[in-house]
């Protein structure tokens, strides 16, 4: 009798724990963040293709898209372009691009976007005309409010000297931010010295003209927009019941996937104090943006990994980054076919690498684990909605 009673107690405990786990997963807020990096967007593009493929297999649904699983998708520079590609609706109100179309997009359009023959000696390296043309062609007249999930795309206004963050949740208070997606994507990609800044105008809530003079959001030290994307999610928690579980910065209730575009540790791409002691403004100008982007990405990852670890939720945060780019793969604008092939291979090889020295789990295994959580959470929410 005592044995039977103990067995029943054990069953109840297991069921209670399982129920609690499901409830916890259902409450999770999911965030995807994609770094800037020009043509190196091929690397996160490869990772996104793998992740979406896993979700399609798990849910037995070839039409499954990343926007169906993430509450917030954020990006800077080329990451902003990827964000738009996987969240902007087509005529069927589905993302106009599947993840497996991202890398082919770079191969088709990259050589024309980064065409050195269009550059000017006393001006931006590229005129940006083809980039704008292809953005208008792909994104049409869609605006921020039409995105299929919350987005966070960053840029920097050189007239007001302030960052500009385009999100759906800001539109009620700031309707002037409901810009066309092609204007936003060009602005996010308009890195100083590479592309001209972008001017466009919208209307305020009173109907007044509102002007933007924008460059790449990485200028606002958000080359890694993960923290920005998390901030958008936590701000929504104050108003949206679907985000309520992360009020008071409860990162235990958040799943965060952050995709990098690669960094380098090559000696000839870094510098010593002795070497730079006599540098002037021109020499510093050529490398300062790269340095600040690398520093901001490192600090963002350091902060987030520390916070998640302190909350014993380190498995809720995954940073996918290649830290050993070499040769031409370090360049944001080398769109030669040979280099793009190398970047695609970097992405494929990255899947087989361990997450860190302390974590032997490969990125492929970690992404499969993430995909399972995303899939289960979506099913739990769908079941709840059906009642």
Curated annotation (Swiss-Prot):
Biological process (GO) annotations held by this record are: defense response; lipid catabolic process
Q: Which organism is it from?
A: Solanum tuberosum (Potato)
Q: Where is the active site?
A: 77 (nucleophile), 216 (proton acceptor)
Domain comment (free text): The nitrogen atoms of the two glycine residues in the GGXR motif define the oxyanion hole, and stabilize the oxyanion that forms during the nucleophilic attack by the catalytic serine during substrate cleavage.
Q: Which Gene Ontology terms cover its molecular function? A: monoacylglycerol lipase activity; nutrient reservoir activity; phospholipase activity
Q: Which residues cross the membrane?
A: none
List the protein's name: Patatin group A-2
Motif, GXGXXG: chain positions: 36-41
Protein's cellular compartments: Vacuole
For the protein in the UniProt heading, the enzyme class is hydrolase
N-terminal signal peptide: 1-23
């Amino acid at each position: 009798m005592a044995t039977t009673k103990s067995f029943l107690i054990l069953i109840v405990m297991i069921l209670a724990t399982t129920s609690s786990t499901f409830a916890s997963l259902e409450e999770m807020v999911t965030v995807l963040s994609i770094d800037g990096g020009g043509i190196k967007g091929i690397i996160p593009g490869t990772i996104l293709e793998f992740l979406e493929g896993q979700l399609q297999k798990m849910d037995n649904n070839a039409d499954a898209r990343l926007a169906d699983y993430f509450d917030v998708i954020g990006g800077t520079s080329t990451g902003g372009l990827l964000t738009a590609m996987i969240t902007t609706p087509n005529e069927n109100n589905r993302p106009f691009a599947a993840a497996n179309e991202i890398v082919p997009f770079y191969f088709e359009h990259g050589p024309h976007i980064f065409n050195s023959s269009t550059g000017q000696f006393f001006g931006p390296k590229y005129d940006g005309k083809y980039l704008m043309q292809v953005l208008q062609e792909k994104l049409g007249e869609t605006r921020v409010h039409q995105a299929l999930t919350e987005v966070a795309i960053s840029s920097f206004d050189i007239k007001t000297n302030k960052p500009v963050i385009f999100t759906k949740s800001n539109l009620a208070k700031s309707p002037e931010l409901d810009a066309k997606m092609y204007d936003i994507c060009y602005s996010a990609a308009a890195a100083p010295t590479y592309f001209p800044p972008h001017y466009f105008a919208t209307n305020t809530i009173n109907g007044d003209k509102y002007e933007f003079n924008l460059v790449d959001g990485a200028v606002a030290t958000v080359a890694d927009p993960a923290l920005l994307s998390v901030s958008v999610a936590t701000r929504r928690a104050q108003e949206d019941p679907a985000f309520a579980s992360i009020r008071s910065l409860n990162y235990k209730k958040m799943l965060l996937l952050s995709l990098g575009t690669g960094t380098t540790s090559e000696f000839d791409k870094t510098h010593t104090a002795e070497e730079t002691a006599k540098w002037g403004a021109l020499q510093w100008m050529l490398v300062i943006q790269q340095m600040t982007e690398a520093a901001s990405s490192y600090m963002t990852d350091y902060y987030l990994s520390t916070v998640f670890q302190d909350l014993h939720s380190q498995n809720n945060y995954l940073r996918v980054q290649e830290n050993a780019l070499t040769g031409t793969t370090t360049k944001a604008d080398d769109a030669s076919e040979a280099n793009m092939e190398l970047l695609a291979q970097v992405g494929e090889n990255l899947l087989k690498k361990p997450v860190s020295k302390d974590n032997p789990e490969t990125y492929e295994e970690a992404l499969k684990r993430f995909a399972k959580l995303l899939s289960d959470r979506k099913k739990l929410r769908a079941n709840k909605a059906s009642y």
